[in-house]
């Protein structure tokens, strides 16, 4: 059975940090493909300014072109309302019934997993491939105590320390500063061509502490 990676996010915008981590996880976890899962309306970002999905999808498509192992899943953007991870994985489980799903996340997301919506069901639907930055320790036993289904379902993968953040990219654009080499050139050109992230609102972080709505 092949392994299929699921990489969820707002991707506002997609940047080289996302791409490098996805490539490392693909190799280390022996994934046949990585599906990038852009969120239409993340439940933990309601009330925050988010770039329209059409632009985020276009940038994602540009960034992934040329890599046959990277693709986009549209299951979240095609349905209305908040996108819960457990619902997304349920739909993907039906669509890819012949593959083993691996939900890709950072160690910060793993730490917050007990607060997510139906965390045990999430762990039942997919393995959890966790990108572990240098010098970070994860208290797995505490997580397993709160999410029993995650026991034996977590795979920790060391990844390079890449200090690129979408919020910083948006801030730099709003301030008229360069984002060269932080995003693929085609994404940089798209941002400039469409005048994205030039307002004060664009400088606000779209990431908030994860809640039970994730």
UniProtKB/Swiss-Prot annotation:
It is an enzyme of class 2 (transferase). Pathway: Cofactor biosynthesis; NAD(+) biosynthesis; deamido-NAD(+) from nicotinate D-ribonucleotide: step 1/1. It catalyses: nicotinate beta-D-ribonucleotide + ATP + H(+) = deamido-NAD(+) + diphosphate. GO terms for biological process: NAD biosynthetic process. Its EC number is 2.7.7.18. Keywords: ATP-binding, NAD, Nucleotide-binding, Nucleotidyltransferase, Pyridine nucleotide biosynthesis, Transferase. One of its GO terms (molecular function) is ATP binding. CDD domains: NMNAT. Belongs to the NadD family. Catalyzes the reversible adenylation of nicotinate mononucleotide (NaMN) to nicotinic acid adenine dinucleotide (NaAD). NCBIfam families: cyt_tran_rel, nicotinate (nicotinamide) nucleotide adenylyltransferase, PRK00071.1-3. HAMAP family: NaMN_adenylyltr. This is Probable nicotinate-nucleotide adenylyltransferase. It comes from Thermomicrobium roseum (strain ATCC 27502 / DSM 5159 / P-2). The lineage of its organism: Bacteria, Pseudomonadati, Thermomicrobiota, Thermomicrobia, Thermomicrobiales. The gene is nadD.
């Amino acid at each position: 059975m092949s392994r299929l990676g699921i990489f969820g996010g707002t991707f506002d915008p997609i940047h080289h940090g996302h791409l490098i981590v996805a490539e490392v996880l693909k190799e280390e976890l022996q994934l046949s493909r990585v599906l990038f899962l852009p969120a239409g309306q993340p439940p933990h970002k309601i009330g925050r300014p988010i770039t329209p999905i059409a632009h985020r999808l276009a940038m994602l498509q540009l960034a992934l072109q040329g890599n046959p192992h990277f693709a986009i899943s549209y299951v979240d953007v095609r349905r209305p309302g908040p996108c819960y991870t457990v619902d997304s994985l349920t739909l993907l489980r039906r669509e890819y019934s012949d593959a083993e799903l691996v939900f890709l996340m950072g160690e910060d997301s793993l730490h917050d997993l007990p607060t997510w919506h139906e965390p045990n069901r999430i762990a039942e639907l997919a393995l959890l491939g966790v990108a572990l930055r240098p010098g970070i320790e994860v208290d797995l036993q505490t997580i397993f105590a709160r999410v029993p289904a995650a026991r034996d379902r977590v795979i920790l993968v060391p990844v390079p320390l890449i200090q690129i953040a979408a919020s910083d990219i948006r801030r730099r654009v709003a301030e008229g500063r360069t984002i060269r080499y932080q995003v693929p050139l085609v994404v940089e050109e798209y941002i400039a061509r469409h005048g994205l992230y030039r307002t004060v609102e664009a400088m606000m972080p779209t990431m908030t502490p994860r809640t039970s709505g994730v």
